[in-house]
Amino acid sequence: MKLFGTDGVRGKAGEFLDSFLAMRLAMAAGIYFKDKSITNNILVGKDTRRSGYMIENAIVSGLTSIGYNVIQIGPMPTPAIAFLTEDMRCDAGIMISASHNPYYDNGIKFFDAHGNKLSEDIEKKIEEIYFDDKLIQASKVDMEKIGQAKRIDDVIGRYIVSIKNSFPKDLTLKSLRVVLDVAHGAAYKVAPTVFKELGAEVIVMSDKPNGLNINENCGALHPANLAAEVKRLRADVGFAFDGDADRLVVVDEKGEVANGDSLLGVLALYLKEQGKLQSSVVATIMSNGALKEFLNKHGIELDTCNVGDKYVLEKLKVNGGNFGGEQSGHIIFSDYAKTGDGLIAALQFSALMLSKKKSASSILGQVKPYPQLLTNLKIAEKKDLDKIKGLKELKKDLENKNINTLFRYSGTENLIRLLLEAKDIKLLEKEMKNVVEFFKKALNG
């Protein structure tokens, strides 16, 4: 049985991800990190889901039972956990979140002592430990060696300082009216504080988490309400975060939702113009063809990798690069953070607007993405795509019509993601119907 997906362990809280799994997974991870232990402390944070309390208590029980001390810091963005794990000299960090998923899902992500997400090899080792009953039993310590847990509520200041340090010292946000949609999630305190302290006029939306409303018709996956509010208030820009604030969606002053690849393109050019861009930009295989064209036009190379911000970071390390991201809004400025950070990306875009003295729409309009259609199709089983009869012929036919394709399974759900890209939207709509019917028969038959 495989536990880890694209981004940690994720599933329906109380069913797949119950307290037993959380406790045993924490023990397995703790056993793995014991060999590298320096401080014997592990940091645990979460987003605002009600199930986070159940999972957090189970994780604390598992870790303390094998002798670890646990530092609990409450609701905090995923990138904050990555930063604070290293900043507070912990052996590892754990984030309890299902990111952009609905409240009834939850997840567990791990970070090493340096704030990096774990490689697939390490995740595999933790899975092996998880299923080793003898090793799990043998790891339990005597009564006097059981670990302690303590809750610290004031670490938010450390993260805020680190975020503000990413913003140019010679700029201020005083001239900007900004609308923030924090998705009733982990950034509901941090995001408004950062923007207010840097001088912006801030209007906040979806900042009243009740444990059940995270991501509900708000945030990065549902930016329509933010777009309407930006127009109504005549704001300069709107920023929408997801439940754990590791992704960003930008809305311009006209209420138009920016394409994620347009955002990547203009931020990459901004870094280059400052002389800060190192090596090539990294995006995923789902990136728009227009991004590559835009970057190449400005003398910037683009490399691609699998979907997931940890793969973007891995590729950046190999290339010696410092900027990359995903169309979905995960944007990595590795000079400032080791994972996608929506707040850092929002501040960098704000700095770009201020330094150019241009509107959000005029900046984002530099990159004109080709039409793409993405369909998430629920499926009964995940067959090997290379062995599906007729798929090669289907892809060849689409290629002959100048349609780019990407078909991939979700790492966390029973879905196949079907992506088509071409210059003719009507052709895409027609062909997507055929593609959906093909996969319905192939995977639900």
Swiss-Prot record:
Pfam family, one: PGM_PMM_IV
Keywords, alphabetical: Isomerase, Magnesium, Metal-binding, Phosphoprotein
Reactions catalysed according to its record: alpha-D-glucosamine 1-phosphate = D-glucosamine 6-phosphate
GO CC, alphabetical: cytosol
PTM annotation, UniProt: Activated by phosphorylation.
Alphabetical list of SUPFAM superfamilies matching this protein: Phosphoglucomutase, C-terminal domain, Phosphoglucomutase, first 3 domains
Cofactor(s) needed for function: Mg(2+)
Catalytic residue list: S99 (phosphoserine intermediate)
Molecular-function GO terms, alphabetical: magnesium ion binding; phosphoglucosamine mutase activity; phosphomannomutase activity
Alphabetical list of InterPro entries matching this protein: A-D-PHexomutase_a/b/a-I, A-D-PHexomutase_a/b/a-I/II/III, A-D-PHexomutase_a/b/a-II, A-D-PHexomutase_a/b/a-III, A-D-PHexomutase_C, A-D-PHexomutase_C_sf, A-D-PHexomutase_CS, Alpha-D-phosphohexomutase_SF
Any one GO BP annotation for this protein: peptidoglycan biosynthetic process
Record-listed E.C. numbers: 5.4.2.10
Amino acids binding Mg(2+): S99, D242, D244, D246
Post-translational modification Phosphoserine, affected residues: S99
Family from the record: Belongs to the phosphohexose mutase family.
Protein name, as recorded: Phosphoglucosamine mutase
Organism expressing this protein natively: Campylobacter jejuni subsp. jejuni serotype O:6 (strain 81116 / NCTC 11828)
Lineage, opening ranks: Bacteria, Pseudomonadati, Campylobacterota, Epsilonproteobacteria, Campylobacterales
Recorded name of the encoding gene: glmM
